[in-house]
Amino acid sequence: MVDIILFRCLGQLHFTQGRNHILLNGRPLHLRGTVENAVFPKTGHAPVCDAEWERIMRIVKDYGLNHIRFHSWCPPAAAFRMADRHGVYLEVEMPMWGKDAEPDEARYDFFRREMRAILKEYGNHPSFVLYCNGNEITGNFDFIEELTADGRKLDTRHLYSGSTARTRVPSDQYYVSQQTNKGPVKVYEGRPSTDWDRSKESDVDVPVISHESGQRCVYPDFREIGKYTGPVEARNFELWREMLTANGMGDQAHDFFRASGALTVVEYKAVIEALLRSSKSAGFQLLSLNDFPGQGYAPVGVLDPFWDLSLIHISEPTRPEPIS
């Protein structure tokens, strides 16, 4: 006789909506997150094995973050399992972006079925805290409200939002945005200081999470070209290297990378500290901890697209003391 032991992940977590914060078991939770843009150059698709997602979750925690927003996509089961294991809170979305909510009944039916499938398949994971329909949506917001309200009725274990960074809907339980009706909550500019924050702008009727904070670009590191060994090639890097060489500055490429990278780290520090000072901020989502080689090219991370340590660092990150 063979004994078969089945393991199922269970979590004794209770997430609720507070005035300014998401509450975890009744206590305010400040989300410190990064945006995951489905960037996997080695394979061209998201990993489905536990090992790779465990690596990503460990990196996220090593940098003092506790949250990942999956930008207009839902990750595979392995991501949820490893987030459960390492205590990373997830925002999950459908593949809805921009004009996807324009009138189209066939598309609407797909989104209704997709939302139900996500909640049914992954709803039991304690790491699945936030659900949002998608990114910067425009179009028919009556449909967005329908989806959001239906989600709240179907599964009360999560908090729901209609869209990031655009129109609010009545069923929103949190709001990811760069701006509220009281002003900007994302820090793009400001004189160097230690006292400015975004408390006033974040003080609305639902918790506000700063949308895609950061976006400070670093000069490309052409040494990354050799890492693109899969279906994705760094043709853009090759063109930029040729242009720099043609203009007589090819030997300065690494200096440009180091200088812009050092400035980016300083700017990210200022942005994060301002949001941490904002007592009424529910959190932030960086764009992003790793570079985003899509939608053009956005080298906005302190890690490269492979989640590897970028050479702009002086030293390895030090794991901070555990905080919620």
Which residues make up each language-model segment?
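Hydrophobic alpha-helical segments that mediate membrane insertion or helix-helix packing
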Residues: 1, 80-83, 314
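N-terminal carbohydrate-binding accessory modules
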Residues: 1-60
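Hydrophobic pocket-lining residues within nucleotide cofactor-binding pockets
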Residues: 10-17, 213, 289, 317
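Substrate-binding/catalytic cleft of secreted carbohydrate-active enzymes
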Residues: 57-59, 67-291, 296-303
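Active-site charged/polar residues at nucleotide-handling catalytic sites that mediate phosphoryl
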Residues: 63
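Short, low-complexity, polybasic intrinsically disordered segments
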Residues: 302-310
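Single conserved hydrophobic/aromatic residue that forms the stacking wall/gate
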Residues: 312-313, 317-324
